[in-house]
């Protein structure tokens, strides 16, 4: 368990293929200056660079539309009202070592993680000739890859990424994995999380001559590795990560190694598994392991670096151990119900949250329904505890897709009706309890209430399977500015009046922590309390047009000096 495992800051544990282990000698410490990069070839552009295969062994293929294609209908042109109601997932990462079908397995695993990002997808493999080969593209995994593209990605190890932008604009150049050539060879990286000191690091690197090709915070990591003087290779990664603040679960690939890293607080999940042929697999969730028939072994521990090569799996402490602060919203909303996250079943957590709601906030009703899909398991728990039947009162159109995790906000009026259709026979004349996972701005909840009343519901009682969200997240989750969060501005009674329900109740924060028991101190609750484990140096602010800024490069920010005030 991540919450109970500690590491020595000076020792390295090596796991051999036969599962025996021994301890390495203590590793030397290295200075960490910001050096001027001599000759870097980071993230070569397909338009301006020499043939990628000639740059430090990096081969790059970008699946972007040709100039002649009609690009007017991209995935980013569509958005609806449900977007305002959900904290949007960050990203998903996959790493595979030791399987001749690495690219195809990576492709399948990314399918399993598609719910974590729909803007773009990419895979990097290492060919038999030790060349890093990349295919990235905008859109869903199935839109970016096909059989012919996977044929261009041979090799026995690979990393993959599905993207939702929390830092950096939505464009092809920001789609990961990123690949860079530097003086010691080539490296690819896929990152889930968000770096709160990104702007500071980027400014320091640019002042010393670094040239950036993207607006993503992940590129900072590659520059830090490139300028590091530490040896051997994994120490360069440790050297770079010790300068980072915030959330990061990352997988790296080089010509002969696969590396997995998780930040010392363990904000975002990262798990390790193994296939029957011995191939090692890393993924953001266990659902990805299940799909490719890899057996779950354990989490990558907070603050751990795992290096996989021909000699086995080596574990190294990243930096002194902190008390883990794992994102509680992985259990409330982000992860799939069939995943095991932070050592707990997501399904069981959500079911218990629903049971708690039924116990703490009962109401006379005839039927329990869910806002699909994320509210279903909690609604089942509520129904089971209350003894009231669960029925499918809202039907979700899955053909629309999870468009709320796409940042464009051009279509807002038809979102709820486009995605959710009421079942009049379930609702008409009934007192209805509606279970949802969260309320962010409140706009979608009000429209759902109105939709149910129009379908004949006699009463509508909203039950929310999480505490009120009162503060923005800076650790890899796209949330609005605090001034746009309805629970930060209004009381529960005022929110109930705003959305038009007959009653409204949230999961109690104290009861949530009580349910987590001895592990309660291992979770991050910043979105519920405003108490940040790693203080953000910039605060999200509402843009004049009504949009919020969550990009670490574009837009204006207000500095905060003396802690967080909500």
Curated annotation (Swiss-Prot):
A single Gene Ontology CC term: plant-type cell wall
Catalytic activity as recorded in UniProt: 5-phospho-beta-D-ribosylamine + L-glutamate + diphosphate = 5-phospho-alpha-D-ribose 1-diphosphate + L-glutamine + H2O
Intrachain disulfide bonds: none
Polar residues compositional bias, start-end: 15-25
Free-text remark on how the cofactor is bound: Binds 1 [4Fe-4S] cluster per subunit.
Matches recorded under SUPFAM superfamilies: N-terminal nucleophile aminohydrolases (Ntn hydrolases), PRTase-like
Residues at the catalytic site: 91 (nucleophile)
Pathway of action: Purine metabolism; IMP biosynthesis via de novo pathway; N(1)-(5-phospho-D-ribosyl)glycinamide from 5-phospho-alpha-D-ribose 1-diphosphate: step 1/2
Key word Magnesium present: yes
Any one GO MF annotation of this record: metal ion binding
Entry's transmembrane regions: none
The EC number(s) this enzyme carries: 2.4.2.14
Functional description taken from the UniProt entry: Catalyzes the first committed step of 'de novo' purine biosynthesis from glutamine. Involved in plastid biogenesis and cell division.
Annotated NCBIfam families: purF (TIGR01134)
Family recorded in the similarity comment: In the C-terminal section; belongs to the purine/pyrimidine phosphoribosyltransferase family.
Protein name per its UniProtKB record: Amidophosphoribosyltransferase 1, chloroplastic
Organism: Arabidopsis thaliana
């Amino acid at each position: 368990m991540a919450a109970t495992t500690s590491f020595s800051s000076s020792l390295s544990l090596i796991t051999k293929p036969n599962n025996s282990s021994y301890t390495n000698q203590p590793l030397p410490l290295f200075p960490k200056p910001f050096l001027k990069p001599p000759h870097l070839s980071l993230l070569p552009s397909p338009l301006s660079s020499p043939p990628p295969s000639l740059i430090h062994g990096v081969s790059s293929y970008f699946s972007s539309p040709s100039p002649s294609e009609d690009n007017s209908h991209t995935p980013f042109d569509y958005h609806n009202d449900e977007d305002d109601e959900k904290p949007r997932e960050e990203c998903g990462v996959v790493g595979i070592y030791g399987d001749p079908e690495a690219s195809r397995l990576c492709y399948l695993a990314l399918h399993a993680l598609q719910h974590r990002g729909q803007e773009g997808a990419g895979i990097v493999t290492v060919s038999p000739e030790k060349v890093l080969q990349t295919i990235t593209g905008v859109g869903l995994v199935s839109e970016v890859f096909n059989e012919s593209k996977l044929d261009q990605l041979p090799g026995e190890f690979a990393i993959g990424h599905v993207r939702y932008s929390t830092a950096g604009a939505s464009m092809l150049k920001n789609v990961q994995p990123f690949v860079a050539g530097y003086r010691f060879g080539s490296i690819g990286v896929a990152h889930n999380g968000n770096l709160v000191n990104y702007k500071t690091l980027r400014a320091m690197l640019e002042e010393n001559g670094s040239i950036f090709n993207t607006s993503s915070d992940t590129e900072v990591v590659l520059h830090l590795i490139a300028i590091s003087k530490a040896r051997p290779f994994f120490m360069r990664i440790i050297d770079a990560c010790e300068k980072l603040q915030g959330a990061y679960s990352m997988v790296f690939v080089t010509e002969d190694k696969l590396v997995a890293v998780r930040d010392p607080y363990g904000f975002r999940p990262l798990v390790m598994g193994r296939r029957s042929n011995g191939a090692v697999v890393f993924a953001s969730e266990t659902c990805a392991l299940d799909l490719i028939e890899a057996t779950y072994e354990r989490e990558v521990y907070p603050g751990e670096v795992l290096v996989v090569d021909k000699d086995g799996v080596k574990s190294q402490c990243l930096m002194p151990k902190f008390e883990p602060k794992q994102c509680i919203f992985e259990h409330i909303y982000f992860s799939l119900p069939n995943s095991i996250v932070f050592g707990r079943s997501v399904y069981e957590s959500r079911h218990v949250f629903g049971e708690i709601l039924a116990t703490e906030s009962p109401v006379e009703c005839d039927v329990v329904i869910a806002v699909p899909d994320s509210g279903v398991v909690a609604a089942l728990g509520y129904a089971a505890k209350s003894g009231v039947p669960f029925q499918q009162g809202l039907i979700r159109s899955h053909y629309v897709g999870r468009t709320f995790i796409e940042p464009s906000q051009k279509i807002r009026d038809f979102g709820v009706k486009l995605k959710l259709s009421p079942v009049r026979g379930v609702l008409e004349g009934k007192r209805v309890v509606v279970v949802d996972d969260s309320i962010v701005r409140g706009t979608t909840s009000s429209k759902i209430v109105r939709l149910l009343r129009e379908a004949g519901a006699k009463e509508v009682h909203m039950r929310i399977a999480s505490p009120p969200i009162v503060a923005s997240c800076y650790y890899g989750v796209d949330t609005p500015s605090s001034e746009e969060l309805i629970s930060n501005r209004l009381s529960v009674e005022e929110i109930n009046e705003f959305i038009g329900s007959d009653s409204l109740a949230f999961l109690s924060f104290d009861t949530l922590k009580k349910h987590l028991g001895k592990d309660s101190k291992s979770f991050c609750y910043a979105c519920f309390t405003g108490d940040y484990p790693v203080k953000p140096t910039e605060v999200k602010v509402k843009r004049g047009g009504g949009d919020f800024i969550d990009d670490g490069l574009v837009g204006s920010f207000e500095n905060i000096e003396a802690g967080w005030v909500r």
